[in-house]
A protein has these predicted regions:
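Sec-type signal peptide cleavage vicinity
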Residues: 2-5, 18-273
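Bacterial N-terminal signal peptides
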Residues: 8-17
Length: 273
């Protein structure tokens, strides 16, 4: 099952005014005043929606992919390249061939942080059982329009997946302190219609997040601070029916599996449930 998401629609909307409005297009990049190389910064931290996920950039290790869209006499020119995060202040530098301004017209930028570093690689989301494995699923994006020549835009990244937070709080089975429950819950699972995500380049030259693979159960990460609490990241989708499974055990009794049913719910990217 494949679910095509609309992550790139925001930038497409940004491009429409550039292509439809009357703009005095300036050609002749060789005569541009100042630096032709696109310069940019990133926010202080990638706004991951998972507490066990990525909470800060790692200078010298992390890099982002930038798509740069600018109107020219022949239409919208798309160029792309990678930028390394070079310091804790969010400074960046081109990784390889730099992205260049073609003229002085306002432009649009769409950027991705892909945890594997390989933009052609698919991400398997089935095992998020540790903080490290949650961070391996963090897929972030940022968009900005009407970027003026000679400025240094700041990109604010947000998550492209939805965050699921499971809290087991059956008050009828807890003692006075919920940290010492009468019934222990473990082996949490969360159902997803798609078990992998990838980036695909569209005909517009922009990248879109695509969810695919078989449906199945995700192993979430236990919260490090709250007992009987788990979290995981899933692609945007609709889910109904048995969505959560827990293994429950009271004392020395035989453990049993309990399923939690939910009404049809639309899980949106960047939100917490």
């Amino acid at each position: 099952m494949r679910v095509n998401l609309s992550i790139s629609l925001a930038l497409t909307a940004m491009l429409l005014p550039l292509s439809c409005s009357k703009i005095n297009v300036q050609e002749g990049a060789g005569s541009l005043p100042g630096n032709r190389v696109l310069e940019l910064t990133v926010g202080s931290g990638p706004a991951t929606k998972a507490s066990a996920g990525k909470t800060a950039w790692i200078p010298g290790t992390d890099r982002i992919h930038v798509t740069f869209a600018q109107p020219t006499e022949s239409g919208i020119a798309i160029s792309e390249g990678f930028y390394n995060i070079k310091n804790s202040d969010g400074g960046t530098e081109p990784d390889g061939k730099p992205v260049l301004w073609q003229n002085t017209n306002p432009a649009a930028i769409h950027a991705w942080y892909w945890p594997s570093g390989d933009f052609s690689a698919k991400i398997d989301i089935s095992d998020q059982s540790t903080p490290e494995k949650v961070r391996a699923v963090d897929a972030l994006s940022a968009s900005i329009s009407d970027v003026k020549f000679g400025t240094k835009p700041n990109l604010s990244f947000g998550h492209t997946l939805a965050k699921i937070r499971i809290l087991w709080r059956d008050e009828s089975r807890l003692w006075s302190n919920w940290r010492n429950p009468e019934v222990l819950a473990s082996n949490a699972r969360f159902f997803s219609n798609s078990m992998e995500v990838s980036l695909e380049k569209e005909s517009t030259g922009l990248y879109a997040l695509t969810a695919g693979g078989d449906a199945g159960w995700i192993v979430p990460c236990p919260d490090e601070d709250e007992q009987m609490t788990w979290e995981c990241l899933i692609p945007a989708q609709k889910i109904s029916g048995a969505a959560i499974k827990l293994t429950l055990q009271k004392g020395e009794e035989e453990p049993y599996e309990s399923a939690v049913f939910i009404e049809e719910t639309t899980f949106e990217a960047g939100k917490t449930y």
